[in-house]
Regions:
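Soluble extramembrane regions of membrane proteins in the secretory/endomembrane system
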Residues: 2-70
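Glycine- and aromatic-enriched membrane alpha-helices
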Residues: 47-48, 52-454
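Short, intrinsically disordered low-complexity segments
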Residues: 1-2, 151
Length: 454
């Protein structure tokens, strides 16, 4: 138990340090605030008094004042956006079950395959339940800069029985919303796959009950607060004028306030999970026979199938993070395709140069490396930037699972830190570079690469 507590505390601390490294040092209001001009008040128009007809024996009754302008109707979710988000949610589930489960299952020894499959599936299921109970509320409601509140326990308030309407969640476009219940489901899958990723770091040597206990505690004290700090904000409609921009930004999560860019979870998902997995591997210790016995994957066929399912599902993961079926979703979609392909080629080239030939395991690992690296950048960089990020990530993660792994000395069973940690860090840093408009990114002329990297 002491090791478990130490693991959680150290893991959360390192993850927070990693997040802070990607944050912008100067507070920057969300882009929506920069383009919203203060609403001009319409000048009051006074209708001239009607003159009484000359023949009228008495003055006419005064004309009634114009009716007050009706308040603007609340935005209505677009059916296309809603359908896209439900499909994206399904794709992320597909990434985990069976994608990640098969990817991990093929990498372990045959005697441990069913154990890993069960851990991935049950961990995902546990987190979905905890997300509905309290996780969503802690991550995506207004509280303070580090954690949300309990306003949405058991998703309370997403349905108004009296009015017969669903609550809406903001997107990144002013006046565009999606049903909050769809947003909650989408984010539940992110939380679930993040916790399932950690399983690979200490696979083949941890009791099932201990895995579930660790997962529940880590989710509560690490994932939910970090998701709030990086992703929670008040939405573009809250920035009704420049006068309130500062107040609205102050209500956002701590890392969001600092201007960090994380489109789909490079820090929240990958660096966060990788640090937890690395610390867990240190604390649990090495597998019996590690370094002495062969621990080669038992089925690269399953690993190939799992990697392919991850690639397909990742389109929902990245493009769905736009929260709308729009141009940014399309940009994230093609960047996910391009960066992954580039990383596969880079890993194979690096492996051929290092070992004399490429391998199926290398190609599958390269695909995951590219997917991880493009995650924080997907909707922020141009296609050229995605190509470069993929190539760099392929080589960097190959080093992460070989040279860096030996330097760290931890038995990270399935190279969670080497792929997700290194890939996440590379992606987070290069997002700061290639988001610049001059390099094909979506940021304007006032964007500073240096401040983002710092």
């Amino acid at each position: 138990m002491k090791k478990l507590i130490a693991t959680l505390l150290l893991g959360a601390g390192l993850a927070f340090a990693g997040l802070s490294a990607t944050a912008q040092t100067t507070t920057e209001a969300p882009p929506a605030a920069a383009v919203v001009a203060p609403a001009a008040e319409a000048p009051a128009v006074t209708a001239p008094a009607a003159e009484a007809p000359a023949a009228a024996p008495a003055a006419a009754a005064p004309a009634e004042a114009p009716a007050a302008a009706e308040a603007a109707p609340a935005p209505t979710p677009n059916k296309g956006d809603t359908a896209w988000m439900m499909v994206s949610t399904l794709l992320v589930v597909f990434m985990t079950i069976p994608g990640l489960a098969l990817f991990y299952g093929g990498l372990v020894r045959s005697k441990n395959m069913l154990s890993v499959l069960m851990q991935v599936m049950v961990v995902f299921s546990l987190i979905v339940v905890l997300w509905v109970v309290y996780g969503y509320s802690l991550a995506f409601t207004e509280g303070n800069a580090f954690i949300g509140s309990f306003d949405r326990l058991f998703l309370a308030g997403v349905w108004d029985n009296t009015a017969g309407t669903f609550a809406n969640a903001a997107t990144f476009s002013k006046g565009v919303v999606i049903p909050e219940i769809v947003f909650a489901a989408f984010q539940a899958t992110f939380a679930g796959i993040t916790c399932a990723l950690i399983v690979g770091a200490f696979a083949e040597r941890m009791k099932f009950s201990a895995v579930l206990l660790f997962t529940a505690i880590w989710f509560t004290f690490s994932y939910a607060p970090i998701a709030h700090m990086v992703w929670f904000w008040m939405g573009p409609d809250a920035y009704s004028s420049a006068d309130v921009a500062g107040d609205m930004t102050a209500k956002a999560g701590y890392i969001w306030q600092m201007g960090a860019l994380d489109f789909a979870g490079g820090t929240v998902v990958h660096i966060n999970a990788a640090v937890a997995g690395l610390v867990g591997a240190y604390m649990v210790g090495k597998r019996i026979g590690y370094g002495k016995e062969s621990m080669a994957p038992h089925s690269l066929t399953l690993t190939m199938v799992g990697a392919s399912l991850l690639w397909v599902g990742w389109f929902g993961f990245n493009a769905g993070s736009a929260l709308e079926a729009n141009g940014f979703a399309a940009l994230a979609f093609i960047n996910t395709l391009v960066a992954t392909a580039a990383a596969v080629l880079a890993w194979c080239i690096g492996e051929a140069l290092h070992k004399g030939k490429a391998s199926m395991l290398g190609a599958a690992s390269g695909a995951v490396a590219g997917l991880v690296a493009i995650t924080p950048a997907a909707g922020n960089v141009g296609v050229g930037g995605a190509l470069i990020i993929g190539f760099i990530a392929g080589f960097a993660c190959l080093w992460g699972v070989s040279g860096l792994k030996k330097m760290l000395g931890a038995d990270d069973s399935l190279d969670v830190f080497g792929v997700h940690g290194v890939g996440g860090i590379v992606g987070a840093l290069l997002t700061g570079v290639f988001s610049a408009g001059s390099l094909g990114g979506v940021k304007g002329d006032d964007y500073s690469i240096a401040s983002q990297l710092l």
